[in-house]
Amino acid sequence: MNDMNSGFVNDLNMILATDFYQLTMGAAYYQYNLENNITEENDIATFELFIRKFPENRNYLIFAGLEQAIQYLLNARFTERTIKFLREKEVFKKIDPSFFDEYLPNFKFNLDVWTMREGNFFFPNEPILRVQGPMFHAQIVETYLLNVINFQSLIASKASRIKNIAPNKVLLEFGTRRSHSPLAGVYAARASYIAGFNGSSNVVADLELGINSSGTMAHSFVQKFDDELDSFDLYYKIYGKNSIFLIDTYDTEKGAQKSCKYGNTIWGVRIDSGDLIDHAKKVRKILDDNGCEKVLIVASSDLNEYKIKEIIDKNAPIDVFGVGTELATSRDDPTIAGVYKLIEYNGEPKIKISEEKVTYPGIKQVHRIYDRNGMFKEDILSLAYEPAPSNSETLLIPIMKDGELITKLPKLDDIQKFYLDNIKKLPKTYKKLEEVDIFELKISEKLRHLTDSLKLKYT
């Protein structure tokens, strides 16, 4: 008998893909409302999700993960198994049985949601997602929303830096084997694709998301045969013009020479080790001297935006970059400071105050201003009821009402197209690889006054 358990998150248990304190708080809210005859209509909370600060050397961020967040809000339910699990927790022994018998079995998220468009660029302290609804509903979604949005926004922002450096190269995401879980590998492929990558090695991302899966061969495929050329022959026999030969198993230049047997009838050759700049120049000469001018050179091997910039600056003839570990883990700074904070309860603005952290209170809106050339100029954070500044773009738009989708989610290709068009509006200074410290979020006078008055009230 197989008693193993995968531990995978699925449609039947994803409601519990959260921190336990979300559920203890939620149950306490329920008990309080029950004892005080408070209905959910009179227990309305508003939260905003935003990033506190840039990861290292970032000057902008890319919003990604919205579709997975919305899927959760539409589909997550408490099942008999999850309810039984919670009921048996000793910590809940003082919670009224109706919580488990009536409330959870019939639970469905009843939330209003506003959001930036997925693929948009944004900056710290700007709400990218706003959630409003009964306190229990709005509270317990925090962990899941942060998980999918933090990670995908982190990877999309990293991929965007790489795309900025190599806008005319083919970019492939190769990081699944080094990502932090199978699901993280899929999400990394998705986030990279949003930020302009052309494909991924991840096959599930192809099956489920339509991101073209691509790959070459491993060194083991070459090593299986006594003669390197035999491995090329077999691969070519099966895959023909789609063949990409890995030529660095033994000797890169000799491998390149052997690949010339097939002329321009193969797609490319890949180099995965050594001095990529030197190897690429020598391989290109070998290919060209043997009439293989159309054969492309693919490079991998712990690539990142800095290494790719050096390769391009030194005119190495590499056509395709496969970027793995550095991208799928955002290795230079693998975290993003995303938070989800209560900013209003039953119409009353709320604020979080500490020595280092202040959360702007009240329901807010982000307005984007462009210059006369259509380039990004500044963002203004204001209270949502304030009139929009003239000639501004309002970034937070309604997407869910009363728990139902009211704005159709775009297809992944359309998200990528929006990103590619929109990122052109961001001045080049923001796209530098080093931190430039030029962004300053403009705060409206009414929001600043509200913030100051609440700080005075609570300190």
Regions found by a protein language model. Name each.
Residues 2-239, 253, 340-459:
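Ordered alpha/beta subdomains of enzyme catalytic regions
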Residues 220-376:
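Glycine-rich phosphate/ribose-binding loops and adjacent secondary-structure elements
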